[in-house]
């Protein structure tokens, strides 16, 4: 049974100055991190800040797995932030995310509540937890034209080499899904090599970091099941609606994964079966890249406390309780 006295004490301690100013819950897709964050927020009277690079877009609901029902626990609405904050078709970035995060984080702290950062976008998470100093990167048309002449495989290798020079991974996992996104990631990386110091000037935020570790085969099973559920729930119709709103196919393809493959199906590039097969493979690869990123975060000095995803929710909450 959860210790209600502990949670009352902790809620008071938040306003009095505990050592952690935030809890971070991260994990790969289909690990159950959002539901864990919501239940924890329920017990702590906390608020959730999303760290998902695609859930920021309005109207991209099924494909990004917003699962807003997770934010209701025992009939109580859990406040969440940085979801549905910009229009589909636009191109949000990690620099904007840092600014939006700080605004929301400060507002939550002003109310003496605890922010819970939750998501699986490694770049966004690390930009907050490591406090990267970022600036806007202007388009470099000459560089883009040069890169467009190269194969996608060569571009990915170039991006890897840039990351090695920067000694970090300043790109999103989905930046490898399309040539356009990889080119933009290279453009940002080259700018950072000459213009920016990726270290810091972002406020240090002490955070307890929890990782949800799901068995590989269970993760694969859940990904496959969830993909078919989303198709049944109208994911193709969602993408058609976005296209009917005037969003260009290439702009949806830019977002990668579901929006890339479903759009290619709608415009006739892929059959339905090809779309499902290729999308399923891509999501499995994406989840693997997420875990690779999180392990890289640990190598770069970020301590992640891993919790087994198969544990009952009550046990997960109690384990987090012992770490606070």
Please place each PLM-identified region on the residue numbering.
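Phosphate/pyrophosphate-binding catalytic cores of soluble transferases and nucleic-acid-acting enzymes
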Residues: 2-324
């Amino acid at each position: 049974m959860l210790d209600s006295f502990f949670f009352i004490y902790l809620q008071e301690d938040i306003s009095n100055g505990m050592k952690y100013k935030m809890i971070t819950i991260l994990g790969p897709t289909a690990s159950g991190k959002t539901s864990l964050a919501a239940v924890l927020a329920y017990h702590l009277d906390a608020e959730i800040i999303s760290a998902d690079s695609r859930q920021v877009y309005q109207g991209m609901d099924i494909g990004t797995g917003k699962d807003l029902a997770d934010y209701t626990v025992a009939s109580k609405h859990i406040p969440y932030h940085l979801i549905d904050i910009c229009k589909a078709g636009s191109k949000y970035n990690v620099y904007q995310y840092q600014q939006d995060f700080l605004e929301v984080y400060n507002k939550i702290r002003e109310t003496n509540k605890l922010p819970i950062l939750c998501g699986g976008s490694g770049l966004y998470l690390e930009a907050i937890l490591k406090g990267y100093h970022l600036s806007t990167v202007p388009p470099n048309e000459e560089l883009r034209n040069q890169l467009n002449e190269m194969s996608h495989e060569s571009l990915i290798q170039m991006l890897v080499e840039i990351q090695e020079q920067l000694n970090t991974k300043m790109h999103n996992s989905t930046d490898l899904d399309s040539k356009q996104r990889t080119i933009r990631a290279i453009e940002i990386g080259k700018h950072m090599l000459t213009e920016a110091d990726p270290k810091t000037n972002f406020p240090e935020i002490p955070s307890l970091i929890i990782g949800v570790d799901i068995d590989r085969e269970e993760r694969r099973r859940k990904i496959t099941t969830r993909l078919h559920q989303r198709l049944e729930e109208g994911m193709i119709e969602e993408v058609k609606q976005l296209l009917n709103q005037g969003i260009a196919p290439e702009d949806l393809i830019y977002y990668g994964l579901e929006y890339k493959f479903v759009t290619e199906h709608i415009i006739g590039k892929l059959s339905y079966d090809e779309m499902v097969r290729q999308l399923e493979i891509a999501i499995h690869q994406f989840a693997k890249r997420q875990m690779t990123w999180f392990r890289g975060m640990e190598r770069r000095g970020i301590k992640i406390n891993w919790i087994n995803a198969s544990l009952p929710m009550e046990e997960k909450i109690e384990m987090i309780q012992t770490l606070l």
